[in-house]
Amino acid sequence: FYLAFHQTMPAKAYMYPYPYEDYTELKVRKYGFHGTSHRYVSGVAQEMLGKKDSKIIVCHLGNGASISAVQNGKVVDTSMGMTPLAGVMMGTRTGDVDPASVIYVMRKRGLSLDEMNNRMNKKSGILGMIGTSSDFRDLDAAKKAGDEKAILAYDMFCYRIQLYIGAYVAAMNGVDAIAFTGGIGENSVGAKKQICEGLSFFGVELDEEKNAKR
């Protein structure tokens, strides 16, 4: 998971608003994951831009997914948190949810901590929404076949990524490039198109021909 690349995040980004002693005594804070991928891809994007002063958003999209804001080669913020459960919707993980909803589901279903942890990490996300697979290729096929749950899950996946991209444009006061990587980021022409179509306000333009190449 390689955490080191994310250690340049400022305290305002990595701190959680728990009682401060939870940070000092328990080290509860955002750490971030997929560091090797974010470091490499942001570096390549920076080289392609040909300038050191750059604002790059990296979208690592696979069964696990994370977004990072990288300014001048340093991470400003990232979507995963203390654990890989935080952030955008993933193959089997919830991503961000209302913390109180966790308590509610546990009480209503009589789940233990371990059972709820397993539910959120292994049984949610795309798998939880469509009930048959966590593979984005299966989701895409079901969407194209007109499955309503698949269409909703696909839209949710793209929407949550758009939200993070928008937030990170604000965090860096602009963006020079958005880089996609990971199995979905490299291969899903449709997902990249849908994500970028909602970002035209930021001046994002998708080259359809290049997007179709893998």
Model-derived features with residue positions:
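Glycine-rich phosphate-binding loop of actin/hexokinase-like ATP-binding domains
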Residues: F5-M106
